Amino acid sequence: MRDFIKFMLLNIGTWVLWFFIVGYLVTKIKDKYLEKDYLFTSLFGFEKDGTWFKKYLKIDKWKDRVPELGGYFGDGFEKRTVADAQSDQIKLFIRETRRAELAHWVMTAGWIFTTAFNPLWAIVFNLVFAHVVNFPCLIIQRYNRARLIKVLNYKN
């Protein structure tokens, strides 16, 4: 039993530490690097206006239930103000969706660290855990960005 507790604490501690490190580091990325989409943050054609997320993933039914921790390391962005926001605020929110998406992509890779001390079954568990925890957040960021880009284009 003692070994199992050590095993669990090691895995949980690894994830908590990884999430905090990544969360902190992405706040240090200069805004200029988040002004446009790159490889991982580029939206696919079917994502462009956000309707795919609503139709097939029913995102509007569950996205508000996902915990939001983005403001933990820095200034958060009050998302409820976006409906009446000026273009600059919308651009800021779009940039922050890129920051959050990048954070979750990197957090997903955290399972790789668990290969150093886990048996195969636990590595597979951590791989699944990484995706189950981060993919809803990734989807929400992509959905929000697609909708915000649409609003920004309409305003301009």
Put a short name on every predicted segment:
Residues 31-93, 150, 154:
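Membrane-proximal soluble regions of multi-pass membrane proteins
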